[in-house]
Amino acid sequence: MPRRRRRRGSSGAGGRGRTCSRTVRAELSFSVSQVERSLREGHYAQRLSRTAPVYLAAVIEYLTAKVPELAGNEAQNSGERNITPLLLDMVVHNDRLLSTLFNTTTISQVAPGED
């Protein structure tokens, strides 16, 4: 009785499986490869783990979704139609976690720099 070989990584009828990017695997919108390239080019550390760019891409994606969402809610509550830099600044400073994260950040056209 002949033995059948089992193929690894094949999908379907003898076809090759498609490679899946780290961005797709992590179900993110921000490119994990771009984040990794930025981390490597920035020379922030001698070594970089495989999961650090994935984690950072997820954090960036979360922040870019959360801050405009909070600003939109604040704009609706105050009867405004547009999200302005002032609203963004107000949202960041009113949220405890965002306030500590952006403690030393100055948003342009909102708070003038110190002379």
From Swiss-Prot:
Signal peptide: none annotated. It is found in: Nucleus; Chromosome. One of its GO terms (molecular function) is structural constituent of chromatin. Present in mature sperm. The keyword Nucleus applies. It comes from the Eukaryota. In contrast to other H2A histones, it does not contain the conserved residues that are the target of post-translational modifications. This is Histone H2A-Bbd type 1. It comes from Homo sapiens (Human).
